[in-house]
Amino acid sequence: MTTGFKEILLINAQKAGFLLSEEIVQKFELYYKELIDWNAKISLTTITEPADAAIKHFLDSILLLHYIPLTGGLIDIGTGAGFPGIPLKIMKPELSVVLVEAVRKKANFLKQIIRLLKLDGIEVYNGRIETLDRHASFDYAVSRAFSEFGMFCRLAEPFIKSGGSLLAMKGSEAKEHTAAHEMTDHGLVCTAIHSYELPMQKGNRSLIIMQKCFT
């Protein structure tokens, strides 16, 4: 099942400008293998084939680094199987990460990955974002598949520092782009919308960046 994953990831990451170290590649491989093993028992993802997983999960996650230099603290809301939070942590070990996942079995998987990969400075919050301590504060909030765009902005905004950013990883839906320009009432300003195509014709993506106004 995992045959070809490493080669596909390495080739396409290099084409995208990422030279992955052997340590990073080993961690991505372990992550993928564990994902496949757990997915046979609990529903984590429908994206399991090597090429699909390499591009749609791992490369898609780290492509975010092309558009914003992540530093400080990141909260990944509705992380599911850990994308993009865990790949970003692997790429940037100095990043402090909180993964928010309401489903207990998925949260247990995330904790296992953190132990397996020996990652420090990353934790799992097993619960809904609405129940997280409002004193928690981050430089970035990211979501790849959480709810609809407006809901993500409303729920994530209280946890972002002034001047911090919300990063919505979406498909190419025009309605999401339009909605991005209508969030000023929530103290957010759209600073950029990046649209791009994944390699191997694996789909189109948009990254919507919303900055929280300074208060």
Model-predicted segments: where are they?
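Class I SAM-dependent transferase core
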Residues: 1-71, 75, 105-122
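Short, flexible micro-motifs
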Residues: 46, 81-88, 167, 174
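Conserved SAM-binding loop of SAM-dependent methyltransferases across substrates and taxa
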Residues: 81-94, 154-157
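Flexible, active-site-adjacent loop/turn segments at secondary-structure boundaries
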Residues: 18, 42-45, 51-52, 81, ...
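S-adenosylmethionine
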Residues: 95-98, 102-215
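Conserved beta-strand/loop positions that form the S-adenosyl-L-methionine
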Residues: 77-79
